[in-house]
């Protein structure tokens, strides 16, 4: 679908007519007789009485025409009203063709300029939209990359494990591990041979002497009890 052709606003048309009068100033100053157009321009409120008196003060016809063009350039309808006045006079219709050609030429130049501005403004927009899309994709990928390592922590040894809020399984297994450790410790303590049992390692000499002394003393302590019991019998 093609974009609509650009159109000129009232402000653009006013500028085009003003430029046309400026471009044709030298030519119109030689051809126009200002006094012939006073009545029509005053009737259309383009000129006032003071304006016509100001124009008439000029010493030559060319200067009076130049001053008239100055007033016409200040009014958006000045050129159109001048063309109407020339058409009413019916003596300088060639001026109408000259003015019309100049206005059309400047109008086309203005349209081409606006068309070029519109095309140039569309291209950066499309490129900017592509850049924004790629930038958003890169931002999303960067965000996902940042989110990925946030759930992993590293131990000093370099081993990785899940973050605390993902360690429910390990916390649930803690009691089982503790029970296993207790069972293993009790089993190991029960299975070890006691001193003096078969398979137990020999005691050091110092401990042997102490054990022997304690046994001798204990037998001596029980001897009187046995003798008393035997004497009573």
UniProtKB/Swiss-Prot annotation:
Site-annotated residues for Cleavage: 228-229
One record GO biological process: cellular defense response
Coiled-coil blocks: none
Polar residues compositional bias, start-end: 130-141
Record lineage: Eukaryota, Metazoa, Chordata, Craniata, Vertebrata
Predominant place of localization: cytoplasm
Source taxon at top rank: Eukaryota
Occurrences of domain CARD (ranges): 13-101
PANTHER family from the UniProt entry: B-CELL LYMPHOMA/LEUKEMIA 10 (PTHR34920), B-CELL LYMPHOMA_LEUKEMIA 10 (PTHR34920:SF1)
PTM description: Phosphorylated. Phosphorylation results in dissociation from TRAF2 and binding to BIRC2/c-IAP2. Phosphorylated by IKBKB/IKKB. Ubiquitinated via both 'Lys-63'-linked and linear ('Met-1'-linked) polyubiquitin chains in response to T-cell receptor (TCR) activation. Ubiquitination is recognized by IKBKG/NEMO, the regulatory subunit of I-kappa-B kinase (IKK), and is required for TCR-induced NF-kappa-B activation. Linear ubiquitination at Lys-17, Lys-31 and Lys-63 is mediated by RNF31/HOIP; linear ubiquitination is recognized with much higher affinity than 'Lys-63'-linked ubiquitin by IKBKG/NEMO. CARD11 is required for linear ubiquitination by HOIP by promoting the targeting of BCL10 to RNF31/HOIP.
Any GO MF annotation of the entry: transcription coactivator activity
A GO-annotated cellular component: immunological synapse
Function: Plays a key role in both adaptive and innate immune signaling by bridging CARD domain-containing proteins to immune activation. Acts by channeling adaptive and innate immune signaling downstream of CARD domain-containing proteins CARD9, CARD11 and CARD14 to activate NF-kappa-B and MAP kinase p38 (MAPK11, MAPK12, MAPK13 and/or MAPK14) pathways which stimulate expression of genes encoding pro-inflammatory cytokines and chemokines.
Statement: the UniProt record of this protein carries the keyword Lyase: no
N-acetylmethionine PTM positions: 1
UniProt-annotated stretches for the region Disordered: 130-149, 186-233
Known partners and oligomeric status: Homomultimer; homooligomerized following recruitment by CARD domain-containing proteins that form a nucleating helical template that recruits BCL10 via CARD-CARD interaction. Self-associates by CARD-CARD interaction and interacts with other CARD-proteins such as CARD9, CARD10, CARD11 and CARD14. Forms a complex with CARD14 and MALT1; resulting in the formation of a CBM (CARD14-BCL10-MALT1) complex. Forms a complex with CARD11 and MALT1; resulting in the formation of a CBM (CARD11-BCL10-MALT1) complex.
Keywords tagged on the record: Acetylation, Adaptive immunity, Apoptosis, Cytoplasm, Immunity, Innate immunity, Isopeptide bond, Membrane, Phosphoprotein, Tumor suppressor, Ubl conjugation
Descriptive protein name: B-cell lymphoma/leukemia 10
Residues joined by cross-link Glycyl lysine isopeptide (Lys-Gly) (interchain with G-Cter in ubiquitin): 17, 31, 63
Subcellular location(s) per record: Cytoplasm, Perinuclear region; Membrane raft
Compositionally biased spans, kind Pro residues: 195-205
PTM annotation (Phosphoserine): residues: 138
